[in-house]
Amino acid sequence: MPEEISQYLFICFKSFFLGIIQGFTEFLPISSTAHLKVVPYLFGWNDLGVSFSASIQLGSAVAIIYYFRNQISLIINSFFSSFNPSKGFKDENSRLFIYIFVASIPILVFGLLIKLYWPNYSDSNLRGLFSIAITSIVMSLLLALSEIYGKRNKLFVDINLNDVIKLGLAQSLALFPGVSRSGITLTSALFSGIERKTAARLSFLVGIPAVSISGLVELFSLFRVLSVIDIIPIIIGIISSFFSSIFAIDLFLKFLSKNNTLVFVYYRLAFGIFILTTL
């Protein structure tokens, strides 16, 4: 087999493998970005960069939409059919539409500002392994505190705008590698007293705009500079992340029906310490 073909097939394999990693870690509170940075390092592979990582998140975004398609359809239909000019939105699902929109504003605004005014962000020390390790440890402690002090008595019907604003601000911290978008939003929701499984579902739903938009922006930017043959590995990564995301979402929701999140606290703590000791 010619060396060029062998190298190309290996790139496709890496994209497939990293797509699985992306999908599985996107919806667990352990940071997909951190794992997409650390796993290639452990295997001695080149870092495929921010654009690749963001692009294959599209598979995860499509997975959320597919998994929650019935609830999303209900949310959209309720939003456009239940508005009362004198009373506003009283239906739970129509309010959830507003909440998803509000929670998405901070991360989209800050993400745009970083892209416009911090062009070298992808090469900054914040994406280094040391920063990821420290962030992982800090986030594990915050998640532990949310388990200890969160009342966990709120369902979707009890969620208010204040809860969502705090969750949206927390979500913007996910712009920094190692934070974990699902992890920090879950932590915020637990601190607000939201029940675990409801908190996870809310975390997944509010992530749809941010994950979708960032993925599309980076994918379109890659389309402008890459040939069709170079895009194929990215498409492979998107597809594999879709299927692993479906598995991870279902697994996590079932897990939270009977368990707390302390296993992820221990994992993130160990993950951070492992990185620090292997730098």
Swiss-Prot record:
Gene name in the database record: uppP
Lineage of the species this protein comes from: Bacteria, Bacillati, Cyanobacteriota, Cyanophyceae, Synechococcales
EC assignment: 3.6.1.27
Further comment found in the protein's record: Bacitracin is thought to be involved in the inhibition of peptidoglycan synthesis by sequestering undecaprenyl diphosphate, thereby reducing the pool of lipid carrier available.
Entry superkingdom: Bacteria
Alphabetically ordered keywords of this record: Antibiotic resistance, Cell inner membrane, Cell membrane, Cell shape, Cell wall biogenesis/degradation, Hydrolase, Membrane, Peptidoglycan synthesis, Transmembrane, Transmembrane helix
GO molecular function, one term: undecaprenyl-diphosphatase activity
NCBIfam families (UniProt xref): PRK00281.2-5 (NF001394), undec_PP_bacA (TIGR00753)
Membrane-spanning intervals of the chain: 10-30, 48-68, 96-116, 128-148, 203-223, 229-249, 259-279
Catalytic activity from the UniProt record: di-trans,octa-cis-undecaprenyl diphosphate + H2O = di-trans,octa-cis-undecaprenyl phosphate + phosphate + H(+)
Known role: Catalyzes the dephosphorylation of undecaprenyl diphosphate (UPP). Confers resistance to bacitracin.
Protein's recorded name: Undecaprenyl-diphosphatase
Membrane topology per record: Multi-pass membrane protein
Localisation per UniProt entry: Cell inner membrane
Gene Ontology cellular-component terms listed: plasma membrane
Single biological process term from Gene Ontology: response to antibiotic
